[in-house]
Design a protein with these regions (language model features):
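Catalytic cores of secreted/periplasmic lytic hydrolases that degrade extracellular macromolecules
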Residues: 63
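Patatin-like phospholipase
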Residues: 1-60, 68-415
Length: 415
């Protein structure tokens, strides 16, 4: 199934003025587009609310971009039309902005190598000359011993003394990994493009101002690279940076994008440390958490059982290294998320409700999409809409009962 429910509240006695949180995890380009399609389906499922009416927005990686717009009262339709159809009020990120090569670090690599070689060579020469000169008593002894008794043994002893002294030791890495750039691409142009959208549409790019004007709580999650700790940006958290800069830090997927430095601190993709950060939404008082994770591992056995058109697939191992990496990343993200779901299901102190939306485990068409391809945005969005619409239909009875307790009416029938 594409929906997992943790229902712990007393639905017969709904809370007054409950807080509803929308938690959006990562997923790169295809995952972000899949989420937009799914959020459109969720919007259509709800009669008297839409997702931008929620109280708390937590965004991780690609989810941080969508969360930032929703918290600014931009509709899902406008985000979708702009980012997928590329004809709405927002400007979609262009290929040259997304694939902005980290040229500075890449071009510096040969210079670093030459500089280190020059430094090591000069230090070795200086060390050799300073360690082996006629004014050193030990050097004179070794030289005298060889001169008075020239032989292969005395020559070996003399050269060993010259080249094996401690003064010649130079500290340098045994494997020069530090010569590799810290990311293929950089996110500066993505941030600038997003900031232009904010400016042109008069959106709040300040956490404090956004909360003051709208009452919406926006939180963006990244990871502090040097401490491996979760970094949370928000009006009552780290609020000293722009929303678009926090988003830039959150989307910096390791190796693909270089780390983002903000005030001397390096950040990478928030999904590295937490898949969704549902715990933070609950900590901030959310009674109902609607969480959307687009990356779920593919199950070949489930595909064979739920494949009405009889299509056949080769195994993931035979599909190449990209498919293996895709499955590994999805498994890591999904497994952590399931541990969190189990924690709240088993925790007697948790009295809220969680609705987790994901693709089905047999969705091979979405699994096959390149996560970093801008060309697959429309396909991913379509899959997201179809997948979530189908899951909402299948779980309608349970969802209708839970949402009703929070004042949300579900549509009688979905097309």
């Amino acid at each position: 199934m594409g929906i997992t429910i943790v229902q712990k509240s007393n639905l017969e006695k709904p809370k007054r003025n409950p807080k509803i949180a929308l938690v959006l995890s990562g997923g790169a380009v295809s995952g972000g587009a899949f989420k937009l399609g799914g959020l459109r389906a969720l919007d259509q499922f709800m009669v008297n609310r839409d997702v931008r009416d929620f109280d708390i927005f937590v965004g991780i990686s690609a989810g941080s971009v969508i969360a930032a717009y929703l918290a600014n009262n931009v509709s899902v339709e406008d985000i979708h039309t702009s980012m997928i159809e590329r004809k709405g009020p927002l400007s979609a990120v262009k290929p040259f902005e997304f694939y902005s090569l980290n040229k500075a670090d890449i071009l510096k690599t040969p210079l670093h190598i030459l500089g280190d070689l020059a430094s090591i060579t000069s230090r070795k020469v200086f060390g050799f000359v300073s360690a082996n000169n006629i004014f050193r008593k030990q050097f004179r002894r070794q030289l005298y011993a060889f001169a008075t008794n020239p032989s292969s043994a005395s020559l070996e002893k003399f050269t060993s003394y010259c080249f094996e002294r401690k003064e010649l030791a130079v500290n340098h890495p045994s494997l020069p990994w530090h010569y590799l750039p810290n990311g293929l691409f950089k996110t500066d142009r993505i941030e600038r493009a997003t900031r232009r959208n904010f400016d042109r549409n008069a959106l709040c790019n300040n956490f404090n101002e956004l909360f003051r004007k709208t009452g919406k709580e926006l939180y963006i999650v990244a990871m502090h690279l040097d401490t491996a700790r979760r970094a949370i940006f928000g009006h009552d958290q780290d609020n000293t940076t722009l929303i678009t800069r926090a988003m830039q830090a959150s989307i910096a997927f390791p190796l693909f994008f270089k780390p983002v430095s903000i005030d001397g601190t390096d950040y990478i993709d928030g999904a590295v440390i937490k898949t969704t950060s549902m715990d933070f939404a609950i900590e901030k008082g959310a009674d109902l958490v609607i969480c959307y994770n687009p990356f779920r591992p593919f199950n070949h056995e489930s595909f064979d059982e739920n494949n009405p058109d009889g299509r056949k697939r080769i195994s993931i191992a035979r599909d190449g290294i990209a498919a293996v990496i895709n499955q590994v990343m999805r498994t890591m993200l999904h497994t952590r998320l399931m541990h969190g779901i189990k924690h709240y299901r088993d925790n007697p102190d948790f009295k809220g409700d969680i609705i987790l939306i994901e693709p089905t485990e047999h969705d091979d068409r979405f699994f096959d999409l390149n996560p970093f391809s801008l060309n697959d945005r429309r396909k991913a969005s379509t899959r997201g809409f179809e997948s979530v619409s189908n899951s909402l239909r299948k779980n309608k009875a349970d969802l209708k009962r839970i949402l009703a307790a929070y004042g949300i009416k579900a549509r009688p029938a979905m097309t």
